Amino acid sequence: MRMVQNNATCWRDFVFLGFSSFGELQLLLFVLFLFLYLVTVTSNVFIIIVIRLDSHLHTPMYLFLSFLSFSETCYTLGIIPRMLSGLVMGGQAISFMGCATQMFFSASWACTNCFLLSVMGFDRYVAICAPLHYASRMNPALCAQLVGTSFLSGYLFGLGMTLVIFRLSFCSSHEIQHFFCDTPPVLSLACGDTRLSELGILILSLMVLLVSFFLITVSYAYILVAILRIPSAEGRRKAFSTCASHLTVVVIHYGCASFMYLRPKASYSLERDQLIAVTYTVATPLLNPIVYSLRNRAVQSALRNAFRGSLLGKG
């Protein structure tokens, strides 16, 4: 069972304990999470398809939304299936390299989501504060650069977090008190002095969360000033309504992420952290199509047209 791998670990694999402490409730959790998983993936994929097929939605706002749906879908696909398998079959083993790979992709997609949300905030800033110049400023070349930078930055930060964690030794235990290879529970298994790695994870997390959140805050500060200058109450309400869904997703996304990653290792709690992780992993990706998209009239119209076209095709 043991092996030496460049002094990085003493174990061949890790074992997820997942929700083993919930006992007989695991079957109920499996049904609940399976339902949420199917709804999340289906709704996000459907949003991507609708935006792709409807020419009225070929704008920067919906381009960014479709990439956010894509990123959320990839994040969900990388975590939830193994979690569901663990609920049915009990403790699931994962190799050292498999754990590192899962951490890299989950961290990369999570970071990418943060950067995409900041890009979407910038898009709302241009749309409200400079509407006459929106088309020229948010041109296809700039949109492609913003999306590409978001994904590249996400991958780089994900790689950095993974390298910081897996340079450590894991000799004391190989049981992960979690349902996937997230940085806090894996870091808690490391033996020896982990203060430098904790500091590295904290710095990387702060760079992702604070920088992207700062950009969103600056964008909305300008948006708020522009909205307050609108003379009519109805005009202010309409302007704010275009940002309300994005703000809802931002608050929940950054609230959960900050609680999960901006704390010292000593403050980790199994039950509490699993609840927050489930909210971040399962519920947050579901908010994208429900809160941000399905409340949007243009998306609602596109969905109706898609269903109408599907029914006519069957007829």
Q: Which residue stretches match the model-derived regions?
A:
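Transmembrane helical core of 7TM receptor-like proteins
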Residues: 1-315
